[in-house]
Swiss-Prot record:
One of its GO terms (biological process) is viral DNA genome packaging. This is Tripartite terminase subunit 2. GO terms for cellular component: host cell nucleus. Belongs to the herpesviridae TRM2 protein family. It comes from the Viruses. Associates with TRM1 and TRM3 to form the tripartite terminase complex. Component of the molecular motor that translocates viral genomic DNA in empty capsid during DNA packaging. Forms a tripartite terminase complex together with TRM1 and TRM3 in the host cytoplasm. Once the complex reaches the host nucleus, it interacts with the capsid portal vertex. This portal forms a ring in which genomic DNA is translocated into the capsid. The keyword Transport does not apply. Keywords: Host nucleus, Viral genome packaging, Viral release from host cell. It is found in: Host nucleus.
C-alpha cells in the first residue's frame, strides 16, 4: 500500500504497487488505495516510450506525429473511396499497410491522451 513510501520521498507507482495488483485490479481501486488514501504522498511521473523506433526517427515532435496521423487518415480515405464502389477487400497491399500503420499510430496517441487524462484527474 501507499504506506510503503516514507514521508517526504517520491517514488514511481509502478515500483510501489505489486505487479500482480497492477495486472488484476481496476485502475479506480488502485487510485483509491494508493493515491486517495494518502494525499500527502507524492509520486514521480514517468512515461514509457511506446513510439515505434521508425516513427520516432522520422517524426521527432508531437506536432509532426499528429500531422502524419491526419495525413495518413486522409490518404487512406482517398485510397479506399477512390476505387469504383469497391470499399472492402479489393484494396491493394499499400492501402492495407497504410491502414495498419495508421491504426498503430492512433493507438499510441490514444495511450498518450489517456495518460494525460489520468494525470489531470490526479492533479484535481
Amino acid at each position: 500500500m501507499a504506506s510503503l513510501i516514507g514521508a517526504g520521498t517520491a517514488a514511481r507507482l509502478d515500483r510501489v504497487i505489486p505487479e500482480q495488483e497492477l495486472a488484476e485490479r481496476p485502475l479506480s481501486e488502485l487510485f483509491r488505495d494508493y493515491v486517495e488514501s494518502a494525499p500527502e504522498r507524492r509520486y514521480e511521473v514517468w512515461f514509457f516510450n511506446v513510439t515505434p523506433p521508425e516513427m520516432e526517427l522520422a517524426l521527432p515532435t508531437t506536432d509532426a506525429k499528429l500531422n502524419y496521423l491526419a495525413h495518413t487518415a486522409n490518404l487512406a480515405s482517398a485510397v479506399r473511396y477512390d476505387c469504383a464502389g469497391d470499399t472492402d477487400g479489393g484494396r491493394c497491399v499499400h492501402a492495407r499497410l497504410l491502414e495498419r500503420r495508421r491504426e498503430r499510430f492512433a493507438k499510441i496517441l490514444n495511450k498518450f491522451l489517456d495518460l494525460h487524462q489520468i494525470l489531470g484527474t490526479i492533479q484535481q
